[in-house]
């Protein structure tokens, strides 16, 4: 006679074991119709699963985050159902959910085209609209294996052989004639799976191992209703317009080529943005009392073995040999900073020491994961390491957090998700040390008035960390900033200071990054601004142009005045109509176009237009110079005349 406790604290008693759906039916027909699954004692369960003992129960509907994830997982099975009908020889591998959707890896000799995706999507919708029931059966390990052997599914058999114990009873989900295996839960009926779209096909190795066969990965998105789907597809269209690779080419910022995969060739305008970011961060380093250093980008294998990178990170490190010595190009800056700290005796009075570097790092990322500026092999980190005592952790982390928000707000990022990752199962140090470290981070977050999500067990083995993820104008999250405590590396590299009692102590090291990879951050802000960089970042801040040849000398004079004031300015004296010039520089996202005609010359002024099409009227040259200088100096996000 199970007693079911509902979220509002009310209870319902049943004479016999009862399913999740039956409990929903006892509450009301509307809830029963909306039921996708349930959370029994905190664990997600199928709507058909029986509850045999006293339990808590939350009904999961399409309005819940879990409900949407279940819809997406069931759409992966629906894709399996459809592809088996259109391509009977296909072998099914795995089909998990991902952010905003799902994918299925399939083994198929035929190379899938966009036309194939359209046909698959059409068949999926035809199947879903029959609103068939999804039937769940728990079977023995042997029955599951026999089922997939008969159906010619070697990947499902491999999953059973390698991942599921023989005394287990895996769940098989029946979509009419199609059968798939999954932990679940899944929707009880396909009426929940009407709003989806197949997006693309990519290659993927079985089990992610390049030694295995290359499969075809079909990506899709799925949502609870048509409105959500259309809104998401609209966001994707906007994201495509903002793609930093497309804008980077149009604005001549950088390029990449096959001979240097994952490495950036910065062109003049892109490098201008890069240097402006460095200059900005340098002003903040001075403000927050950091010293700037520069370490070598390549060091002997012996050092990397001491740090543990060689053993744990070796696959991602580029190596070379010289004079019978093996070297690795640094994937990160921290070991070099410890070497600098170790030069000379340090006292507790010297701490904290805040050491920053714009470090050129390289990581041998898989070629398939490379993506424009967002995922590269060669990058520059705005990295810093703070050497301090345990007593200084909280105040130093508090300062790091203030610096993070100070810098992000300059770019207009105010919606920031904060996550605190705590001790993993495998870790160094005792519980007391971890208690102090985690509490220090939590106190620093509280001191800054920040709400945060705790990620249990997600910290590094050497210390807990805080992550900062920017949410952009398309509601995407970009994890950029980190504040990481490290109780291991300083000791491994024999870092020490003389404490107040004259004993040698090992300092705590705080790893701190704000922009993260400067390359990636440029990609992020290129998409955030859609290439309309604020005037302080714009490679060219103003273009001065004439209407006829008679204004050429005045244009050159105005251009020199702006240039002498430290502004990035160009002149356009081409024999073209002024409307043509304005359109061209508007497409180049130049903030201001200064038009000089006979009237402007006679008054000593310029006619000012913006890249958004606003005609701001005339300004004296001196007045406009001061306006633009103030915008650049204060790093304003908006142009003159913009609200």
Curated annotation (Swiss-Prot):
Coiled coil: none annotated. It catalyses: tRNA(Thr) + L-threonine + ATP = L-threonyl-tRNA(Thr) + AMP + diphosphate + H(+). Keywords: Aminoacyl-tRNA synthetase, ATP-binding, Cytoplasm, Ligase, Metal-binding, Nucleotide-binding, Protein biosynthesis, RNA-binding, tRNA-binding, Zinc. GO terms for molecular function: ATP binding; metal ion binding; threonine-tRNA ligase activity; tRNA binding. PROSITE patterns: AA_TRNA_LIGASE_II, TGS. Residues 243-534 are annotated as: Catalytic. The keyword Chaperone does not apply. Zn(2+) binds at residues 334, 385, 511. GO terms for cellular component: cytosol. InterPro entries: aa-tRNA-synt_IIb, aa-tRNA-synth_II, aa-tRNA-synth_II/BPL/LPL, Anticodon-bd, Anticodon-bd_dom_sf, Beta-grasp_dom_sf, TGS, TGS-like. Catalyzes the attachment of threonine to tRNA(Thr) in a two-step reaction: L-threonine is first activated by ATP to form Thr-AMP and then transferred to the acceptor end of tRNA(Thr). Also edits incorrectly charged L-seryl-tRNA(Thr). Homodimer. Belongs to the class-II aminoacyl-tRNA synthetase family. This is Threonine--tRNA ligase. It comes from Mannheimia succiniciproducens (strain KCTC 0769BP / MBEL55E). The lineage of its organism: Bacteria, Pseudomonadati, Pseudomonadota, Gammaproteobacteria, Pasteurellales. The gene is thrS.
């Amino acid at each position: 006679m199970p007693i079911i406790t509902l979220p509002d604290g009310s209870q319902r008693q049943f004479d016999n074991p009862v399913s999740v759906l039956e409990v929903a039916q006892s509450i009301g027909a509307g809830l029963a119709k909306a039921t996708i699954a349930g959370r029994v004692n905190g664990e997600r369960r199928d709507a058909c699963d029986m509850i045999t003992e006293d339990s808590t129960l939350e009904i999961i509907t399409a309005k819940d985050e879990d409900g949407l994830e279940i819809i997406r997982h069931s759409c992966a099975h629906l894709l399996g159902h459809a592809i088996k009908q259109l391509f009977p020889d296909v072998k099914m591998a795995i089909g998990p959910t991902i952010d905003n959707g799902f994918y299925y890896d399939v083994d198929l000799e035929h190379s899938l085209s966009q036309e194939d995706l359209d046909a698959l999507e059409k068949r999926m919708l035809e199947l879903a609209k029959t609103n068939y029931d999804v039937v769940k059966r728990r079977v023995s390990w042997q029955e599951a294996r026999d089922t997939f052997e008969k159906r010619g599914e070697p990947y499902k058999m491999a999953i059973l052989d390698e991942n599921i114990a023989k005394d287990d009873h895996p769940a098989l989900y029946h979509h009419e004639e199609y059968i798939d295996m999954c932990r679940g839960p899944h929707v009880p009926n396909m009426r929940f799976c009407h709003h989806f779209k197949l997006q693309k096909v990519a290659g993927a190795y079985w089990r992610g191992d390049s030694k295995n066969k290359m499969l075809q990965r079909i990506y899709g998105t799925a949502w609870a209703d048509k409105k959500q789907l259309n809104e998401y597809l609209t966001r994707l269209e906007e994201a495509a317009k903002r793609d930093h690779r497309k804008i980077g080419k149009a604005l001549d910022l950088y390029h990449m080529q096959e001979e240097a995969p994952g490495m950036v060739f910065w062109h003049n305008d892109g490098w201008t943005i890069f240097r402006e970011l460095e200059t900005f961060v340098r002003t903040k380093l001075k403000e927050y009392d950091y010293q700037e250093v520069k370490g070598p980008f390549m060091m002997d294998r012996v050092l990397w073995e001491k740090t543990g990178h060689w053993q744990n990170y070796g696959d991602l490190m580029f190596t070379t040999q010289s004079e019978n010595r093996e070297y690795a190009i640094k994937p990160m800056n921290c070991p070099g900073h410890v070497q600098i700290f170790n030069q000379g005796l340090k006292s507790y009075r010297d701490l904290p020491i805040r050491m920053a570097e714009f470090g050129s790092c390289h990581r041998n990322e898989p070629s398939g994961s490379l993506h424009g500026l967002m995922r590269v092999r060669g990058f520059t980190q705005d990295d810093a390491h703070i050497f301090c005592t345990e007593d200084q952790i909280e105040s130093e982390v508090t300062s790091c957090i203030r610096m993070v928000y100070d810098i992000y707000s300059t770019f207009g990022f105010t919606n920031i998700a904060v996550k605190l990752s705590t001790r993993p199962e495998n870790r160094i140090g005792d519980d007391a040390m971890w208690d102090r470290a985690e509490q220090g981070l939590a106190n620093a977050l509280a001191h800054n008035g920040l709400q945060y999500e705790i990620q249990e067990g997600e910290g590094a083995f050497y210390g807990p960390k805080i992550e900062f993820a920017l949410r952009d104008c398309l509601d995407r999250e970009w994890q950029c900033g980190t504040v990481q405590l490290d109780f291991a590396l300083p000791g491994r590299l024999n870092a020490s200071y003389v404490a107040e009692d004259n004993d040698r102590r090992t300092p705590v090291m705080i790893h701190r990054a704000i922009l993260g990879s400067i390359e990636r951050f440029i990609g992020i802000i290129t998409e955030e601004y859609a290439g309309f960089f604020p005037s302080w970042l714009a490679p060219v801040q103003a273009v001065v142009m004439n209407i006829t040849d008679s204004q050429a000398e005045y244009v050159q004079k105005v251009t020199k005045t702006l240039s002498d004031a430290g502004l990035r300015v160009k002149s356009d004296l081409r024999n073209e109509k002024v409307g043509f010039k304005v359109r061209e520089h508007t497409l180049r996202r130049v903030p201001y176009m200064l038009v000089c005609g006979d009237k402007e010359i006679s008054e000593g002024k310029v006619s000012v237009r913006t890249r958004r099409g606003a005609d701001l009227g005339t300004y004296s040259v001196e007045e406009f110079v001061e306006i633009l200088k103030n915008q650049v100096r204060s790093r304003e996000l908006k142009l003159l005349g913009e609200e």
